[in-house]
Design a protein with these regions (language model features):
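Basic, flexible Lys/Arg- and Gly-enriched helix-loop patches that mediate nucleic-acid binding at interfaces
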Residues: 1-278
Length: 278
């Protein structure tokens, strides 16, 4: 049975489908003796090369997902030419496959990031087709008027695309911010464009001084996961995310992983401090 090259590599944990498609477009992938093209179909017997290194036609990688609480000051890419610390430096090692990020957060944004071993799942969770909600806590400087809120919910042209918040909730009382020139809001987006939250507020003349993602679809950042730490999603939670994007995945009862996840959660909970926004 054959399948598209980009899906073949994504399902084996080499990267998200979007990443693999970019590698193919850049000429970094060869199929047998020819430069690969997007849409090429492959079977287990074909020879695939990435950056002149032969790709092992390994079995499908088991699907795992971790929830990571990103601190400010870390870069969300796998490499950084300026030598800044990476989120990937804090992730647990894998025997097979690699961690693939479901989207990114910029260096000055903190909060929830999802990482998975399933490239196809990562691609679908990011894809605009599924319009998965992302919720953020955002602190802006200045007095926000009703007209600003209405404009942000109606839609703003940023570049050549319209963006908008699906919802905006005032959160000052909840977070007990005593500095009234700083206003906290919880906002919801149905997409993950670069700097979208900041750009929307800037369109109304407001600077964002703090930004924290608190949920991605049904996954909420647990209060026991402190900045720089992570926790595994259960098989039930993984299946829920996969169903959300119409993806059938094989889940095996990995007792070793379950025990490791339970130990990790007990360790994090024993520290006893909740994640707070300052």
């Amino acid at each position: 049975m054959d399948e598209k090259l980009q899906k073949f590599l994504a399902n084996r944990g080499y990267g998200s489908r979007r990443q693999v498609e970019q590698w193919i477009s850049d000429g970094r992938v060869r199929l047998n003796n020819s430069v690969a093209k997007i849409g090429d179909r492959v079977s287990i017997n074909d020879s695939i090369f990435l950056d002149n290194k032969k790709v092992r036609s390994r079995e499908l990688v088991e699907t795992h997902i971790i929830v990571y609480n990103k601190p400010e000051g870390l870069v969300s890419t796998t490499k950084d030419t300026r030598g800044r610390p990476l989120v990937f430096d804090n992730l647990p090692p894998l025997k097979r496959g690699k961690w693939i990020s479901v989207g990114r957060l910029d260096i000055n944004t903190s909060g929830l990031m999802l990482f998975t071993t399933n490239g196809e799942l990562a691609n679908r969770l990011m894809h605009p087709k599924y319009s998965i909600d992302r919720k953020y806590l955002v602190r802006v400087y200045g007095k926000v008027e009703k007209k600003n809120i209405e404009a942000l919910k109606k839609g703003i042209l940023i570049g050549d695309e319209y963006s908008r918040f699906k919802s905006i909730e005032f959160k000052n009382e909840v977070l007990k911010d005593q500095v009234r020139l700083n206003n906290w809001f919880q906002v919801t987006l149905g997409s993950g464009k670069n700097r979208e939250v900041r750009s929307l507020w800037e369109s109304q003349g407001f600077d964002v001084s703090r930004l924290k993602r608190i949920s991605y679809g049904p996954v909420i950042l647990p209060s026991f996961v402190r900045p720089g730490n992570y926790t595994y999603l259960s098989e039930k939670e993984v299946a829920q995310l996969a169903n959300l994007v119409n993806l059938n995945i094989a889940l095996r009862n990995d007792l070793t992983l379950q025990k490791k996840s339970q130990r990790n959660e007990r360790r994090l909970r024993s520290k006893g401090s909740k994640v707070k926004v300052r």
